[in-house]
């Protein structure tokens, strides 16, 4: 067992993230953002510098916090955006030796509205499959998304998306039916 956390909550720039991580005696960062941008959104040359800096520091990245299907994206959004994020994330995770990627199940609609569950499951099965095909594990994060509605929604998600794992982030909102 090891401890890790999102170092972008300590600082925006990578040098300060590395420093904060080392100051508490950790050697791993759950990577999400550098200089205000998610790792899968950084330009290639900037990502290469990040990867080299991590290598030089001895800090490893066991988990990648992505924007894939997050609470800011509606289920009606263009799925090509998600596919492009996946296509950028996979080689970057492989470069960093990262095995886990946090995903979500898209923004919830106001309670009582059509949640387009079948489309959610279709997308999440595709997302999971693309990472699995690359030898990586997608993990669904509890947050303000369909899978975070309730424990029943979370269990249904796991039933509908075989192989999907869960991550429970204690800093995220408590499960509740309606956050609209």
Residue ranges and their predicted role:
Residues 64, 128-180:
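Acidic/histidine-rich catalytic cores of soluble enzymes
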Residues 9-11, 33-35, 67-70, 105-109, ...:
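Active-site-proximal loop/turn and secondary-structure-junction residues that shape catalytic pockets
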Residues 93-114, 134-143:
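Active-site groove signature of glycoside hydrolases
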Residues 41-49, 77-88, 112-123, 145, ...:
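Alpha-helix N-cap and loop-to-helix initiation/capping positions
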